[in-house]
Amino acid sequence: MARRKTTKRKVKKNVPFGIAHIHTTFNNTIVTITDANGNAITWSSAGALGFKGSRKSTPFAAQLAAEAVAKAAMEHGMAKIEVFIAGPGPGREAAVRSLQAAGLEITAIKDVTAVPHNGCRPPKSPRG
């Protein structure tokens, strides 16, 4: 008889304060909530919610991803968050608004988008 695999159950941590990292690209939006040390508590993305193709890059998809993360974070006892936004995508404002509407108190919003000091050549711009 085969042995049953023992899996770790998700432990409910009591974390009152956290950091929300919103990473928006032109193709997707990823929202991760960490504790003050940077250990991930929960995450979600537009693709993980079932959006495919060009629908992943919409503000609505970013909104739903942020809502899912906020609900999971509040189950861990989180009430206040600091928001770090990175990337040029369309879901930036929608994700922040959604976190606030879900009931999390936002203490600070910081843009941490990496700006090159003339590093790599960017992709060619679409002509239309």
Curated annotation (Swiss-Prot):
Provide any one GO MF term from the record: rRNA binding
Its function, per the record, reads:
Located on the platform of the 30S subunit, it bridges several disparate RNA helices of the 16S rRNA. Forms part of the Shine-Dalgarno cleft in the 70S ribosome.
Summary of subunit composition and partner proteins: Part of the 30S ribosomal subunit. Interacts with proteins S7 and S18. Binds to IF-3.
Entry annotated with the keyword Ribonucleoprotein: yes
Annotated protein name in UniProt: Small ribosomal subunit protein uS11
Tell me which Gene Ontology terms the entry assigns under biological process. translation
Q: Name one GO cellular component term.
A: ribonucleoprotein complex
Instruction: State the family named in the UniProt similarity comment for this chain.
Output: Belongs to the universal ribosomal protein uS11 family.
Q: Which UniProt keywords apply?
A: Ribonucleoprotein, Ribosomal protein, RNA-binding, rRNA-binding
Ribosomal protein recorded as keyword: yes
Q: Which gene encodes it?
A: rpsK
Alphabetical list of PANTHER family matching this protein: 40S RIBOSOMAL PROTEIN S14/30S RIBOSOMAL PROTEIN S11
